C-alpha cells in the first residue's frame, strides 16, 4: 500500500524572477523536487509536459506505470485520459465538419435514427457545446436499465438509454455538462467516417501526427504498449466497468498528447477559425459552480478571467489527467497520472508552479 503524499505549496518563499530563463530554471528545479518524491516512494506516478512561447521547457516523468513489474513511467507510457478525451473527440468532429462530411447544425437524429423522436431538435453543435439537454448517463448507472451491464459500451448505452423520453431543457437554451453528449458525438463521427471511432481518429489525426501510442478503449492494447495501470481503490464506477468512448475511453501518452496539442494550436487538426469556435463559449452561463464556461470540448475560464485559456481535466478510477492551452500567455501543459488521490496533491502543486512562474509572470 502507499499513502497519500502531502506537499506544502511554498512558491511565495521564492521570488519569481523577471528574466524568462531564470523563471524556467526555477520551475525545473521546483518540479524536479516534487517528482523526485514519486521516484522515492516507488508507487504510481506522473508525467508532466510544459511549453512556454513555443519552447518545451519541461518534459519529465516519475513513478511506476506498473508496480508489480517495477515498470517505470516514461514519455511513451499510455494513460486513460478520462474526460480529457473530450477535446480530441470534439476536434475530430470539427475536422469532419470542415471537410464537409457533416454539418454542425444538422440534427443528431439524422445520423442516429434510433434516438428517441423527442430528441429530434438536438444538433451536433448542441452536443459539442453541452447545450443538448440530455441527462448524463454517469448519474444513472445505478438504474435498473444499466445496473449489471459490466463493460458498458456506446452501443449498449444507446439501446438502453434510461432517460430516452425526456430532456432536462430545450436544446440550445441552457448549458449542462453531460457525458452522454460525447457518446453520441463518437457514434456520429463513426457514421460520418464509415469506420469505427478509433479507426476514424487514427486515420485522420493520430497517424498523420505520428501518434503511435494512442488508441481507444475498444482497440487492441497489445501493440508494444506500456499501459500505466490504474491504482485506485476500485476499477469500476458504481459497480460497472465503463468502456464508453468519446467522453472518455481514449488512451494516450505524454509525447503523443504534446504532438496533438501543438498541432491543434497550429491549425493542423482543425483550422484556426475552428479552434477559435471551439474555445468560444456559446452561452455566458457557467457549466460548473466554480464559474467556468464550456466551448466545444474545452472548459473555459469565467468571464474576464485568463482570456485565451482553455483546459480539460479527467478523472476516472485512478487516472487523473489534464490538458491545458493558452493562446494569450502561450503557456501549454499536460499532466498525466495513475495514482488517484495519492498523486493528486502533486498534480495540484505542479499546476500551482506553472501558474505562479509562467502565467502570472511579469
Describe these PLM feature segments:
Residues 39-47, 69-126, 167-180, 245-248, ...:
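Short active-site loop at a secondary-structure junction
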Residues 303-305, 340-362:
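Short, gly/Ser/Thr-rich active-site loops of penicillin-recognizing serine hydrolases
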Residues 1-4:
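Bacterial N-terminal signal peptides
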